[in-house]
């Protein structure tokens, strides 16, 4: 789950504004388990409504339901996820070591949740990262230094246009900065050390983890 990132997502739903999404998420996160569990679901809320009864599909296969997660960026959201008993999804838009305080906020809140959303606590953090792992170490590093990899950042800047970005941030379709410079082994090592990427052979990647 999440509040949405960028006008491409938010404006699709009747012009939803970023300032509205926190309250809307608070409403919907508690309703998702009910949608899974009930065949005669209805809801009347401040941000949205389902005049009922409706059988919301699809439903989880078998007993129970999947773990519930929320995409997190700031410390408050990490702590809120922990307090609600749901998992936190983190992204490496900055050096991965900077997330230490946010992970601690999550774990502290998860130790004594004020509420459990759903049937069970999902006390986990999932963190995304770029990974290039090959038996051939040099080939993995060659791919990591390729110019095309930089297009990921330009796409993030395009679609996540409601998030702050650096003044020198480049947005697609403009060519990424990586096409203007020749990546060196030293530069790649700095990226790996900062936690922006895992790269190398299986032994190296395991060590980086």
Where in this protein do the model-derived segments appear?
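Hydrophobic faces of well-ordered beta-strands that scaffold small-molecule active sites
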Residues: 1-3, 68-71, 86-91, 123-129
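Short intrinsically disordered, low-complexity coil segments enriched in acidic
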Residues: 1-7, 206-209
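Glycine-rich beta-alpha junction loops
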Residues: 5-7, 72-74, 93-96, 129-135
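Acidic/polar active-site rim loop that often engages polyanionic ligands
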Residues: 6-16, 83-85
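An alpha-helical appendage that flanks or caps ligand/catalytic pockets
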Residues: 19-57, 97-209
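A local structural motif
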Residues: 61-67
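A conserved active-site cap/scaffold subdomain adjacent to cofactor or substrate pockets
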Residues: 73-103
